[in-house]
Amino acid sequence: MEQVNELKEKGNKALSAGNIDDALQCYSEAIKLDPQNHVLYSNRSAAYAKKGDYQKAYEDGCKTVDLKPDWGKGYSRKAAALEFLNRFEEAKRTYEEGLKHEANNLQLKEGLQNMEARLAERKFMNPFNLPNLYQKLENDPRTRTLLSDPTYRELIEQLRNKPSDLGTKIQDPRIMTTLSVLLGVDLGSMDEEEEAATPPPPPPSKKEAKPEPMEEDLPENKKQALKEKEMGNEAYKKKDFDMALKHYDRAKELDPTNMTYITNQAAVHFEKGDYNKCRELCEKAIEVGRENREDYRQIAKAYARIGNSYFKEERYKDAIHFYNKSLAEHRTPDVLKKCQQAEKILKEQERLAYINPDLALEEKNKGNECFQKGDYPQAMKHYTEAIKRNPKDAKLYSNRAACYTKLLEFQLALKDCEECIQLEPTFIKGYTRKAAALEAMKDYTKAMDVYQKALELDSSCKEAADGYQRCMMAQYNRHDSPEDVKRRAMADPEVQQIMSDPAMRLILEQMQKDPQALSEHLKNPVIAQKIQKLMDVGLIAIR
């Protein structure tokens, strides 16, 4: 049994430090030695959830409940995994089942409230944004025939992209039928169902269930401690921090087993800007919480406050460490967002610290040597390193674009040329290399435009003048097959995006069947721009 406890503690430390695989290994070894220990399955469930393996987290949560049906945390683990698996109804039932055994468990109560809110949100989600929308409509006889009507498809796409228009379209019987199919309910009988559900009003029952009389069961010292805490909270709201500290200190003396009073003191010191004291108290609170088996959400809050204190001091690495500890105990959107923010700032700081123009020049020279030898992949690596060392040097992007062109990676070459031009709009090479990439892609119209811009900057640029002439001749002598035109057009990311847009495909179908519809669509500047793009690349022609 001693070995089991050692493995469990080792697993707990690994999980707190973010070493999830080590934690899983420790818990699994402990389970082999003591397969009836419900706490081990609970801890491993938390580790699997942290890793993102929610199915295994759910299985361990179920095992925890099987071994210890009267233990609230087992239900919390199981329900949390179900939440991550988007099985909200089952998660709600699990929280409710847990509350039958531990009616005053704060963690289960909060979980149930969260699930009820999530399920309520689902009623207001956009049903027209389902990934299998058209498949669902095709499979139902009520909507199958409607799909042959282009105006119906256009209406569906409108609601898919702008669900706020639903209120103005709800009177359309086709939309009512569609909603019935998508939501899987008969909307005609909804009013009756709602009326039937109204008689037992939820608010009064919630008030009756609120455990206010529970304070009568508390020992006198804990009652007094709660009163002191309330007085401390009032003082805190008024920013009378010294008075708040006195009340929290008194509450802590009356009930030394409750970590909340210590974290409240930490909050006061945080507001006063004494971050060292704040962290010291949070560590103490966590220690008290662990000793008294406090709800892990409270432990998570203490870790998050330590993270916030480091964030305030711009010590982002330390902040991330404690945010991760908080998330290991309990994941909340606020802490996750703060952690991601700290990671983003730290990454940017590291990027800026990496900048060194002297080392960039060394890498550039190495790249030039490799380029002259024809070793383009190696040259590209040196130019990439040079860009990391000096990301504001336009010439580095131009050099790497030349490598990409040699390696036939024309889209990447174009991207680097755009960056080069943005950094130094008067640098001729940026334009000539961009035009060369477009010319290689046989997009002669665009290539001529770019060569023309280069000539506007320097009318004596022979490279631009020769390139312009080549493109003119190639365009004149061009006899592409429709397949070549389509293949070349579909290599353009902008064309790919237009052609994958269901609304645009519907418009193009309408144009084929009814050419008069074009004039109506061209009134929309966004659609007109997309149609012009398709005309430029030769995919469509208007006679």
Curated annotation (Swiss-Prot):
Highest rank taxon of the organism: Eukaryota
PROSITE patterns: TPR (PS50005), TPR_REGION (PS50293)
Modified residues (N6-acetyllysine): 8, 301, 312, 325, 344, 446
Modified residues (Phosphothreonine): 198, 332
STI1 domain: residues covered: 130-169, 492-531
Disordered: region residues: 191-233
Post-translational modification N-acetylmethionine, affected residues: 1
Record PTM Phosphotyrosine, positions in chain: 354
InterPro entries: STI1/HOP_DP (IPR041243), STI1_HS-bd (IPR006636), TPR-like_helical_dom_sf (IPR011990), TPR_rpt (IPR019734)
Motif mapping: Bipartite nuclear localization signal: 222-239
Record keywords: Acetylation, Cytoplasm, Isopeptide bond, Nucleus, Phosphoprotein, Repeat, TPR repeat, Ubl conjugation
Subunit structure: Probably forms a complex composed of chaperones HSP90 and HSP70, co-chaperones STIP1/HOP, CDC37, PPP5C, PTGES3/p23, TSC1 and client protein TSC2. Forms a complex with HSPA8/HSC70, HSPCA/HSP-86 and HSPCB/HSP-84. Interacts with PACRG. Interacts with EEF1AKMT3. Interacts with HSP90/HSP90AA1; the interaction dissociates the PPP5C:HSP90AA1 interaction. Interacts with FLCN, FNIP1 and FNIP2. Interacts with HSPA8/HSC70. Interacts with HSP90AB1; upon SMYD2-dependent HSP90AB1 methylation.
The protein's name in its UniProt record: Stress-induced-phosphoprotein 1
Naturally occurring in which organism (per UniProt): Cricetulus griseus (Chinese hamster)
The organism's taxonomic lineage, starting at the top: Eukaryota, Metazoa, Chordata, Craniata, Vertebrata
